[in-house]
Amino acid sequence: MTINQATIDFIRQHQDEDVRQLAFLGSKYPEVNMPFALDQIRGRKMAHVKLPRWASIEGIIYPPHISMEQCSSEQTALYKAELAARLLGLSVSSSENEKECEKASNSHFFKICEFASEGAVDSEFAKNEDTCKKQQILTECDKYVNKSKEKPNEEDFSEEIEFVDLTGGFGVDFSYIASRLGVKSMYVERQAHLCEAAKENFERLGLKNVSVKNGDGIEVLHSFHSKKNAASDTLGITEEQSQSLLKTNFGLKLIFIDPARRDDAGNKVVSLKDCTPDVTVLQEEMLSKADYVIIKLSPMLDWHRAVCELSHVREVHIVSVNNECKELLLVLSARNMGMNMVSGTDLGEKHDENLRIFCINDSQSFVCDETEMASSAVKIASPDKIVSSSVKAVKKVSSDRITSPALDEMPYLYEPNASLMKAGCFGVLSERYDAKMLSKNSHLFVSEESVEAFPGRAFHIIAVSSFNKKELKRQLSGITKANIATRNFPLSVAELRKRLKLKDGGETYIFATTLSDESHVLVICERGI
């Protein structure tokens, strides 16, 4: 990719300025490739928040705005890299890597390593120091980044490829996964300008053993040998030994695919079959050619429906950042997923192959399986355990609010994080943490004892009020502002705030909800337990 000096100088001189104003300067700088320059200035600003490590490296080429919006963040890319490493049996990290991770400017990588070592990302990784030393983690401190001058290979070397990204895009996911795995990897992308940018960027990121291919991902998939053919050609394994060859090291180890979720008119689609390419059609071919397939989908898609439309789905990963659901990942495999929890190696014996659901939100993680979901029932709190109609034996609390002794039985309230809300595993939550929901549709939990490990936000209930005017006045006495949320409630937050005459913010949290007896209440809380 050739960029003239005038354009480079313009980008450096105006990198902190408003691109909307810079767009009017085209006639003043005729030698500058203005569309490209604006993409770089805008892209780098977005990268400071979304991809801080990339933003810190000089010379990274950013794509047009739409591609920057759609690409993964550094945090979610790191999660996928660790997921891929666990599937391929790599070590979570050596002691050296842990030290380097602590030095990194982005601490999310170290948290993800903790998930894996504690089993939240399924199990411990195989301890393999030699493999770990070969890995080049993109979040290491500067002296470990951008030292290699080796350019990405132009050859396909498809017979040696172990990881392929069939829908490369901007290359964020590919770069982190390829770097983490340390195997020969292929990036495939139909758009030539993204391929050109990828070549430049992978060189600056110090990626080795990677191939950039401008082409159609489906055609590239067709070019790979199946595991059966690869083993047959190399070892003479026959068709009757097909079960054994799933454990061979020939052919692809991992396929990553991120199907486009917009139609030709640019409208978002909600069905897996409407995405491009259609993975429901490609799944059998992908599984015949790779040990594992990771499909990245929109969090808007119904994961239950997606699992039904696909075969061999072994894991569902719902990934949130700052309590905002960002990605839905499906792991497919036709091989035995049973793993030795100590060594991370395949024991070759029959294991429980229930679908597992991983709910991730920053440092919070929650894992369950479909059998547990099916057998678990949500416990519903009795209304009289939340607020009593009796007025005798009352006691005073802060700000002269009055509550009944019955409230003391359930003084803690919990709001599940976004990933759990998407997963819908409320019965498992209820049984695992001995917590009860206020009502079937409230998705708010209460408990007698504090549960510090609850995956979500935790609150201490200081009062519960009905909508009786006198009671409202008493319970809200001294409160001028509050953070208000509604759950299974007839009024919107704006309508309720206007009615209560409360400003936004402060340290008080009010949840307006409906109890199991259909009564409407305000649960007044303070953050923390």
Task: Locate each region found by the language model.
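SAM-dependent transferase fold signal centered on methyltransferase-like domains
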Residues: 1-529
